[in-house]
Amino acid sequence: MPWRGSSITFMSALLVTDRDLASAAAAYFRDLQGRICSAFEALEESGTFTHRAWSRPEGHRLQGGGETRLMRGRVFEKVGVNVSHVWGTLQPQFKMQIPGAEESHGKFQACGISLVAHMHNPHVPAVHMNLRYLSTSRAWFGGGSDLTPTFPNAEDTAAFHDALRGACDSYRADAYREFKEACDKYFYLPHRQEPRGVGGIFFDQLASSDPSADFAFVRAVGEAFLGVFPQIVARRKDTPFDAAAREQLLVKRGRYVEFNLVYDRGTQFGFGTDADPEAYLMSLPPLVRW
């Protein structure tokens, strides 16, 4: 049966008390996916997203599914915007890594949206955005967004950070500083001793005494991304470039691949949950060079 998003079946499997919050999060992620794809298609003259729904068969240790949307074009060389909502039992080696999973005997539920865009023009930065809700015996939000330019542009970097700062300031006064520092620490390649890009924000295990405020912040991050990144693309997509710049872009993508396959928690989570490989490996660029 094709995956059709949240339903009473999903609700019967929730492991948290506030079922309405989990349902609302899944619904928001699907809505945001649609609006982001529409904004990106407006920047790509002849490109449209392909849609592929996936679901786990009855009797599998995991249930649920998701939708992978992918577009390849002149502006967006490859962009994927995925949503998923899955539940079931974690493999034993992941129980100790996921908070509350041992207490829930490996039972978990997760929903989220994940986006990665690799651009054709070296002057348009690559971007990543992820928002998620996860529950075991505990429940929390996580996510963030970061920019990876080949040729850093001060105007674009400032606009991106200002948008995310606005979302953070609506949550609490020290949130931007905390989440920016976490991003700089997380998106770093220790073996090369260099950052992946120019940063952004990153947060995990966000579970305050007010879950509705946490969810409002997650929505604010989604709206901030939608407001700023299409503007950056529109400004830079027609900037002239030569073969040397394109070569540098491909080498920069190599750093992206190294990080995502070696360090990225989302990729490791995908490996551990038997999720759709096309979804959690969506972040890999179409062409790369070392």
How should these model regions be labeled?
Residues 167-217, 232-234:
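Long, charged, mostly alpha-helical binding arms that flank functional sites
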Residues 267-290:
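Long, contiguous binding/interaction regions
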